[in-house]
Amino acid sequence: INFEYRFGVLLFCLQLISCATNSVYSPLLRAEPEIGSELTRAPRTLRLYFDELPDVSQSSLRLVGPNGEHQLRGLHTMSENDLMIEIIDPVTRGEYRVEWVTAVGADPGVYSGTFNFSVPAEGN
């Protein structure tokens, strides 16, 4: 069997393995604003709920909107398996992406993900 055939089979197997591992566990249960929601008013905070208490020291949240990254402050937990942070600058109409990173419970793994929400024009 030639080298190209073996190499092709190897690449195919690696691709199958990567597909099988793409359905990875995520500790995120829900969020405020809701994942994929269209809001009637601009949020002043972000709050993400996990299946176990997140480690704040190993966590970060980012909010990216139509005008770039928003300033956030005061990442903390309310002891409800959550992370909460204040949005400093005004959230205007448009599409937003929340990027999160955290470690939860006794699990040594660090997890990450993104979700979107939108703020429509007034009157919509």
Residue ranges and their predicted role:
Residues 31-33:
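Short, solvent-exposed loop/edge segments of extracellular or virion-exposed proteins
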Residues 1-9:
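Bacterial N-terminal signal peptides that target proteins for export
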Residues 25-28, 37-41, 45-124:
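Acidic, low-complexity Ser/Thr/Gly/Pro-rich repeat segments typical of extracellular/periplasmic
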